[in-house]
Amino acid sequence: MAEVNGCQLPEDRLYYINPDKNAFIWAKEEDGVFTIGLTSVAAAMAGRLVAYTPKKVGKAVKKDKSVATIESGKWVGPVPSPFDGEIVEVNEALKGNPALVNDDPYGQGWIAKVKPANPEEAKSVLVDANKAAELLQPIVQEKGVKCG
């Protein structure tokens, strides 16, 4: 497992890291659909989540556009999609307990499931855990992010 300042990045998934878009997203493919969520780094930066407002199932999303809005005591913002696609499922459990994103970002705290418009293009923007750790290192240092 890759790690940055105590923030884990499981190697069984891919990552979309784009600081300009505030995108620190993981993605895991199953049967042509990607489950996406916040990395532990993003969850730590946001703070304890108090609200989760997903877009509607069936909605088309563009790369870097919101699949959901999340809110903590210190931050409100979008969860960007790593690629163009369609939202096929949202995590209903987060509506009642958004802090699952903080407690279990790579499990029960997933954000949405997105079917990419172009699967090959989707995979081309994602990186493995080691590359994600490399990209996240300067951000974690600059912002003083710690996990665990």
UniProtKB/Swiss-Prot annotation:
The modification N6-lipoyllysine is found at K74. Residues 33-115 form the Lipoyl-binding domain. InterPro entries: 2-oxoA_DH_lipoyl-BS, Biotin_lipoyl, GCV_H, GCV_H/Fam206, Single_hybrid_motif. GO terms for cellular component: cytosol; glycine cleavage complex. Binds 1 lipoyl cofactor covalently. It comes from the Bacteria. Its cofactor is (R)-lipoate. Keywords: Lipoyl. One of its GO terms (biological process) is glycine decarboxylation via glycine cleavage system. Belongs to the GcvH family. The glycine cleavage system catalyzes the degradation of glycine. The H protein shuttles the methylamine group of glycine from the P protein to the T protein. The glycine cleavage system is composed of four proteins: P, T, L and H. This is Glycine cleavage system H protein 5. It comes from Aquifex aeolicus (strain VF5). The lineage of its organism: Bacteria, Pseudomonadati, Aquificota, Aquificia, Aquificales.
